[in-house]
């Protein structure tokens, strides 16, 4: 996959998790919630500050992250694979 995000954008592949009810039944389709965890596939060079300085991103390729899914998150299909394009601001944590 050749994709290069610009500035403070990050490309994330969602990690699907198996959803189970309290009784152990596997939930599918609309009953299952989408995961807000993913693996970083690509990162931009950084956020450009008002003075022109480039502030490097905290996340790096290979990091597992927890993200907020909302207005700023865009879903794209690249080479048949669904990925998320988001700003680093939409990433809430890095899982270590």
From Swiss-Prot:
GO-annotated cellular components: cytoplasm
CDD domains noted in UniProt: cpn10
Pfam families: Cpn10
UniProtKB keywords: Chaperone, Cytoplasm
Domain of life according to the entry: Bacteria
GO BP terms, alphabetized: chaperone cofactor-dependent protein refolding
Family, as annotated: Belongs to the GroES chaperonin family.
HAMAP family for this protein: CH10
Matches recorded under PANTHER family: 10 KDA HEAT SHOCK PROTEIN, CO-CHAPERONIN GROES
Function comment: Together with the chaperonin GroEL, plays an essential role in assisting protein folding. The GroEL-GroES system forms a nano-cage that allows encapsulation of the non-native substrate proteins and provides a physical environment optimized to promote and accelerate protein folding. GroES binds to the apical surface of the GroEL ring, thereby capping the opening of the GroEL channel.
Subunit structure, interactors included: Heptamer of 7 subunits arranged in a ring. Interacts with the chaperonin GroEL.
Protein name: Co-chaperonin GroES
Gene source species: Vibrio campbellii (strain ATCC BAA-1116)
Gene that encodes the chain: groES
């Amino acid at each position: 996959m050749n994709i290069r995000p610009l500035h403070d954008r990050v490309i994330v592949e969602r990690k699907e998790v198996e959803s189970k009810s309290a009784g152990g039944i596997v939930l599918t389709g609309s009953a299952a919630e989408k995961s807000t965890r993913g693996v970083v596939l690509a990162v931009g060079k950084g956020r450009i500050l008002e003075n022109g300085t480039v502030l490097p991103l905290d996340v790096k390729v290979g990091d597992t992250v927890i993200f907020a899914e909302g207005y700023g998150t865009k879903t794209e299909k690249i080479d048949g694979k669904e990925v998320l394009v988001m700003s680093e601001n939409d990433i809430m944590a890095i899982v270590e």
